[in-house]
Amino acid sequence: MYGINQRYLYISFHFFVVWCHAQGEKNHPSPNFKQYVREQGSLTDQLSRRQVRVYQLYSRTSGKHVQIRGHRVSATADDGNSYARLYVETDTFGSRVRIKGAESGRYLCMNRRGKLVGKPNGRGRDCIFTEIVLENNYTALENARHEGWFVAFTRKGRPIRASKTRQNQREVHFIKRLHKGPQPFPNAEQPKHFEFISFPSTRRAKRNRKHQTAS
């Protein structure tokens, strides 16, 4: 009888521990992984080395490439134009980037009214964009400061006010293309062929030749 009561108490205690553990899990909800990724992706990485990519942005509507000429931004550059070459610098571990014109040295930015402008300094959040790869394989660029505002151009290559843009519009769709012009750093130098350099023969080499002829 004593053994049965002891076993009953043991089983009851075991179920009590399991019940307490289940209640603890209910009180502590599982972490939101998507929210964590979103928060970490919105922080600027100040420690890691910047990764710089070089390409052109082909506008789906204008059929031309994005260019930054001083303060003005348009999508009217031909393929291979020096102003169409862009340096795309990573800002975080995610898909946030800064876009800089290789020829003008200006950054692609968006002001309070949603107008695209070129600025010499691209440290502000208005000069940071999130690359969004769409289902149709096009890329959309959403401004980091103004959520829901995208880079967009008309058929004539003129910038559209970002407050009137949506992700599913053709005007915000771009294709990344390699630049046909000369390669920037670190590929500025073209591959060189090996050159054979002739050195004058040393005294020891002359002695060896005399020894071979004598033998």
From Swiss-Prot:
Protein's recorded name: Fibroblast growth factor 17
Alphabetical list of Pfam families matching this protein: FGF
InterPro entries, alphabetized: Fibroblast_GF_fam (IPR002209), IL1/FGF (IPR008996)
GO BP term (any one): positive regulation of cell population proliferation
Coiled coil ranges: none
A GO CC term attached to the entry: cytoplasm
Subcellular location per the Swiss-Prot or TrEMBL entry: Secreted
Organism: Danio rerio
Glycosylated residues (UniProt): 137
Family of this protein: Belongs to the heparin-binding growth factors family.
Residues of the signal peptide: 1-22
